[in-house]
Amino acid sequence: MTHTEDEHKFRQGRMASFFKREDPTYDRWERTCQPKSALGKGAYLALYFLPGLLAAIVINVPAVFSTELRITHLSPRYLQFGWLLIITLGWHLLSPFIFLRLLDGLTIRESLSYLGLDRIDLKGIFAVLPVFCFAFALVSVPYIQFVWTPLSTFLQAVPLFHVPPWSIFGGDPAGLYAFPPYALAVLFVGNFVGEELYYRGYLMKKTSFLGRANWFVNPLLFALYHLWQIPFTWPLIGLVFAFGLLMWLRKDLYVLIAFHFFVNM
């Protein structure tokens, strides 16, 4: 092996060590809390879709939505806001702790460790994440123009994927961002923290039976779960793989929460 080849391998190793982080605690929970049966594996895959299916039914189905309005006497906007809080702060944040206790027998402290809430990757946040976000921005700008725009237009023309006119997710930013700042702050916590806790902190370990495909399948199912706003989220599938890749590289929940915040801003 020549000196040049040695130097090239050394540089590759340094670059890999910069981006890739090992976490024995992450690996241990990934091994010990795996579903054993085919039914169990299917159930965890189904858990990717259930929150989105619920949101699509209670927001997008006219008969269901009108019934909710009559019962609650809420405005359409605040009824949807209430459902978002239930799903993001309730389902996403609480269900992992409930499932880990009932199905895996973990204590609160063990659940915090499983989810990655008890440790933080400072190098990932302050060194790796800025580089990753810069690369993501370089890819996303042309992607939005040349891929997202035509795909979104196509999906909006499909009746099955139609977003109803009362939806705050109809593509107009004013629909969602017209809420008071304090309400948006609560919602954003549920969004950034809740979705990452549920999809990366909890489910990504549970579906590690997928092997090397796990980092790819996890963000794919995460994108598809947005059933209540298909024309605007499904076209982003080409970009969301960055979430699974970053979790595979750093194995840290807080890095993903920060990245989610960057992407949504």
Task: Please give the residue ranges for each predicted region.
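Transmembrane helix-loop-helix hairpins at the membrane interface
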Residues: 7-10, 14, 162-265
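Short helix-kink/termination motifs in transmembrane helices of multi-pass secondary transporters
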Residues: 53, 57, 137, 141, ...
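Juxtamembrane helix-loop-helix connectors linking adjacent transmembrane helices
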Residues: 68-79, 109-191
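Structural signal for membrane-spanning alpha-helices in multi-pass inner-membrane proteins
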Residues: 95-104, 139-140, 222, 226, ...
